[in-house]
Structure formats: C-alpha cells, structure tokens
UniProtKB/Swiss-Prot annotation:
Superkingdom assignment: Eukaryota
GO molecular function: endonuclease activity; nucleic acid binding; RNA nuclease activity
Keyword set includes Protease: no
SS bond list: 50-110, 64-123, 82-138, 89-98
Active-site residues from the entry: 42 (proton acceptor), 155 (proton donor)
Protein name: Eosinophil cationic protein
Annotated compartments: Secreted
Residues listed as glycosylation sites in the UniProt record: 84, 92, 119
GO biological process terms, semicolon-separated: chemotaxis; defense response to Gram-positive bacterium; innate immune response in mucosa
The keyword Disulfide bond belongs to this UniProt entry's keyword annotation: yes
Length: 160
C-alpha cells in the first residue's frame, strides 16, 4: 500500500500558491496606476532595439520579461481606441471591456532569447517589427491618472 502524500486540500493550496507566484511575476509596481504601467510597458513611438527598450520594464520587475509588444503610437491615440465598440476580450473571454483598433499600427514585438539569464542586465531580446491591429482592455481612470482621459487603456490583450 502506498501512503497518500497529498490530500485534495493540499493540492489546491499548492496550485493556488503557484498561481500566486505566477501572478506576482506580472504584477504592476505599486507606484503606478494600471494606465501608467500600460504606457510604460506598451507605448513607445520610437522604440530602440528590444534589448534596450526592455531594460526599463525589467528594472521595475527585477526579472527578464519573456515577451513584450511596444505600440509605436501615442497614449492619446490608444485612449481613442477605448471609444471603439466594446468587445469580449480575446485572451480573457470573461471580460467585455476590450476595444479593437480601427487601423494597423507599427509595433515592435520583443522575445527573450536567453531565458536562463540570472541578472536583468544580461537579458537579450530578438526584435520583430510589424504593423498590426491591436486589442486593449479599458477602464475608468484611477484618481491618480490625468483627468484629461476619463477612460484609459490598462491592458494590451492581443495583437491581430
């Protein structure tokens, strides 16, 4: 007879713990609103090469982010996408606060090419430029955000 090592309750706690660790890897630094963090991660009109552009994000998160997309547009243009018709978010089908861009924008997608990097100063990325539609999730602004925009982008859901 084999001893029972894990009860269903322990398995659930382990799973929730792993999800918490994964969620914390993608957590927004507390000094930023969701919209501010969105802008830092995804808005860059003239991004340099990925390895350089990703340093800011990696410095805040203290790790090498696996991938990221920079939209080569302004925050104001992305706010305007929030005025488009609401759709179900392609990546999170339970959310209905997504909006699809009306036109393709230039972008730079970055893929980590050395995932075993132990130090954020050694993160290296492959550059994949493109021109695509995108979908953002939008929410009412945080009181710390500029009152100029009542609804702001908070999440880049997908690139089409």
């Amino acid at each position: 007879m084999v001893p029972k090592l894990f009860t269903p309750q322990i398995c659930l706690l382990l799973l929730l713990g792993l999800m918490g660790v994964e969620g914390s890897l993608h957590a927004r630094p507390p000094q930023f609103t969701k919209a501010q963090w969105f802008a830092i991660q995804h808005i860059n009109v003239n991004p340099p090469r990925c390895t350089i552009a990703m340093r800011v994000i990696n410095n805040y998160q203290r790790r090498c982010k696996n991938q990221n997309t920079f939209l080569r547009t302004t925050f104001a243009n992305t706010v305007n996408v929030c005025r488009n018709r609401s759709i179900r978010c392609p990546r999170n089908r339970t959310l209905h606060n997504c909006h699809r861009s009306s036109y393709r924008v230039p972008l730079l997608h970055c893929d980590l090419i050395n995932p075993g990097a132990q130090n954020i100063s050694t993160c290296r990325y492959a550059d994949r430029p493109g021109r695509r539609f995108y979908v953002v999730a939008c929410e009412s602004r945080d009181p710390r955000d500029s009152p100029r925009y009542p609804v702001v982008p908070v999440h880049l859901d997908t690139i089409i």
